[in-house]
Amino acid sequence: MSVKNISSAILGVGVDDTTIDLFESQYPVPTGVSYNSYVIRDEKIAILDTVDDRATDEWLANVTEALAGEKPAYLVVHHMEPDHGANVARLAALYPEMQVVGNAKTFQYMEQFFGAEAIAKERRVVVKDGESLSLGAHTLTFVFAPMVHWPEVMVSYESTEKVLFSADGFGRFGAVAKFDEKADWASEARRYYLNIVGKYLSLIHI
């Protein structure tokens, strides 16, 4: 997957992984998976989520292309599971002036994954449920979504273009490049929901 234009300002920089055979080492994924990540270009540039270590090089190439020589102001971390957050520390090291946005639990998990010094406290933007971050013409509003499917998960809504960045909330097995509109799209979405999110239904309050 190369850089995709979601809109004139929102770019998809995620990566398809068609070599993986088991998601989380237990769920068969014959058509692979996609690691979703985005860049919002505005007065302040934001990168939304990273990707799994399996896809680091391709993802960094996509990010570099999307940035077009500019530097990001923010990295927004919706979810710390490795398929979303494995490259947080690596990106922070590449862009030392970039701030990292997450909630309090996000940074607890980050320290467990990367160590307390990976993201200096002065670089952390700790958001609360319902708070917003302005990038210029675009604004992200954060909504906590605990147990979809880890305790720290949050989603963000961009109000100008009306785009929801939903973390695992509307996930589906299968790489984007392998998506067939004629196939039963719902079956893989249903299988993902039941196996990844559904087991926590009693704990979900959104």
Regions found by a protein language model. Give the residues of each.
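Metallo-beta-lactamase
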Residues: K4-S8, V101-V153, Y200
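Active-site metal-binding motif and surrounding structural segment of the metallo-beta-lactamase
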Residues: E43, R54-V101
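Short catalytic-loop micro-motif centered on adjacent basic/acidic residues
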Residues: A46-D49, A73-V77, T141-F142
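Active-site environment of divalent metal-dependent phosphoester hydrolases
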Residues: M80-G85, F107-M110, H149-W150, G171-G174
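Active-site gating loops and adjacent loop-to-helix segments of metal-dependent hydrolytic enzymes
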Residues: F173-I196
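Conserved small/polar residues in nucleotide/adenosyl-binding loops
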Residues: H205-I206
